[in-house]
Amino acid sequence: MGKEAKTNAMRILEREKVAYTAHEYPHEEGVAVDGVTVAASMGEDPACVYKTLVTQGSSKNYFVFVIPVAAELDLKAAARSVGEKSVAMIHVAEINKVTGYVRGGCSPVGMKKQYRTVFDESVLTQQKVYVSCGRIGTQVCCAPADLIRAARAATAKIIF
């Protein structure tokens, strides 16, 4: 990555001894790009590029779900996976306050607080997985098991 500043997510991956590579993609400064476009711009299969979604449960606790960019979160399955009656996506305006990240640059690693995190079980079928590194324009790629460990996450079937 050269002299590019490391993000909190990158520092945590290094601290946890997770081997990763950083990959930049073209974007307009500060403008979020959808995940399928990110995958295409990096020449990667969207099945191995994951997005980080933040929800709030009926208990008012926050939960993080990480799913393939082309998939849709099954809110009922997601709620079941964390023992909640229901979960709902948080409003875009709350993302930075809750996570410390911006929309389009939200990483499952290195949020302000450690929220309960669940990856869709499809991640276990991938050789490598890409997630945001905490800023728009850069993704990190690493082995799924290492990423799950660094994010202190579980896996469950949470997509349709």
Locate predicted features.
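Extended, low-hydrophobicity, polar/charged segments
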Residues: 1-160
